[in-house]
Amino acid sequence: MPFHFSPINFIHYYLKREATQFFTSIAIRYLGLGMVLIFEPIYIYLYFGRSIPLTLLFIGSIHGLFALLVVFGGKLISKIGLRHAMLFSNFFIFGYYLSLFFINISIFFVPLAILLKSIGFTLFWPAFHIDFARFSKKDHRGLQVGKLNIAVLIPTIFSPIIGGAVLAVFGYSVLFTIVLIILLISAIPLFLSKDHQELYTDSYHKAWGRMFKKINFRNDLALISNSLELSINAYLWPLFMFVMAIGYGTIGGIISFSLAITAIFSFYAGKIADSAFRSRLLKTGSVLTSISWVMKYFVLTPFDAFLTHALYRISRTLAGIPFSSTFYDIAAAKKEEADEFIIYREIIHNISRMFFLFLLAGVFLVFPKINSFFLVAAVLSLGLMFLGDQTKPDKK
């Protein structure tokens, strides 16, 4: 009997598994977001007349509002389910980029953009972390975090180059339109998913009070360090390259080639993170990440930027995979309280980022040298190790 290959049947078979649906949706999402994320701070920077303080105040406001809304988000996620929350978040992110598209028409779109992105984050990130903590298995969590990294990295290897090319030829309006379409497509796999309900029980006071518990002190330090270091990479590093007069296409190329190198390490770092060497891997990655930030301080040319960012991405992967694996281990060990722990993480992650970005905005008024803050990131990178000593996998 002849074999008939049906693309529709193949896609249906491929998307039957819950993890596959999750990873596919994330991969498509980052294909779109990867086109614009690296250029987004630059767009906002140009809108505010090349003012770094105003740019940081705008971004910090998003994270601050996210921190204030996330407890309500946890209760809403309890009602609509994890997958539906991630699905609905796309429409708010869609609205955010639409607001950026029209931001030059009226200043009204500035607060609207802040509100829409905050709501989008509130629906997506807690649901994302809870879902991953639930379906990933303890014995293979490092490997699954590595696979998640690859699901994010593979599309984002190409998307910054594509985004940079679109931006250089057609401008931001066409780029935002493409991103909006891809975001909507990324929701399709979630329609195929069996949803999961969580019961989030923390009051507003109890959720915020978790930050001040003595038992969470080391977690606090690790999560704050992680958040602030990522902020410098996400917001100041792109601005630094732009101020250096590196073109959009070159910036996209630097990010893409660095991510390509990183993808090679993600799978192996994930396997090591499932062994008794997780803590050692985290410490090694944290130290190397710190060194890479010191090297970024001395960047003068696009080639320097490529080399140092490639080292950073490799080092950050070596630190980030065991860090995330440990975080998900702690969350999963909480069982019914996993969602409460993750909401606590979102509060401390974003409120610390808001205060940090607001502080930087003030500092930039009197000390506008961007690369000086790369040395701050070098110190913050070492703070990731505070999480590494708390949960170690059993030796096998």
Regions found by a protein language model. Name each.
Residues 27, 107-124, 224, 303-320:
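Hydrophobic core of transmembrane alpha-helices in multi-pass small-molecule transporters
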Residues 84-99, 180, 280-295:
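Structural signature of the two symmetry-related core transmembrane helices
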Residues 3-67, 213-256, 312, 373-374:
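Helix-loop boundary and gating motifs at the non-cytosolic
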Residues 68-104:
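Conserved MFS/SLC helix-loop-helix module at the cytosolic interface between two early adjacent transmembrane helices
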Residues 69-82, 167, 264-278:
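Helix-to-loop junctions at the C-terminal end of transmembrane segments
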Residues 123-137, 317-335:
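Intracellular juxtamembrane helix-capping segments at the cytosolic ends
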Residues 174-192, 371-389:
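Symmetry-related core transmembrane helices of the 12-TM Major Facilitator Superfamily/SLC fold
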Residues 115-152:
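Cytoplasmic helix-loop-helix junction between adjacent transmembrane helices
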